[in-house]
C-alpha cells in the first residue's frame, strides 16, 4: 500500500512540474510572438466572407475571391 501511495505521489509531482514547465513555455512563446509581430514585417490580414479582395490569398481559409464586386466567398470548387 505504501508503494502505491509513493508512486501516486511521484506521478503527481511529475505532472505538476511538467505543467509549470508548459506554462512557462507558453508565456515565452506569447512574448516571442508579440515581439515578432511588433518588430517583424507587417502581417497581411485575411478577409472574411464578403471582404474586399483582388486575389484568393486576400481571403481567409477556404474562401475564394470572387472579384471586387463579389468579395470573398465560399466555393465548392478549389480556388483558381
Swiss-Prot record:
Keyword Signal: yes
Cystine crosslinks: 46-60, 53-65, 59-72, 64-79
Propeptide residues according to the Swiss-Prot or TrEMBL record: 20-42
Alphabetic keyword roster: Disulfide bond, Secreted, Signal, Toxin
Subcellular localization: Secreted
Any Pfam family: Conotoxin
Domain free text: The cysteine framework is XI (C-C-CC-CC-C-C).
Name this polypeptide is given: Conotoxin Pu11.1
Species classification: Eukaryota, Metazoa, Spiralia, Lophotrochozoa, Mollusca
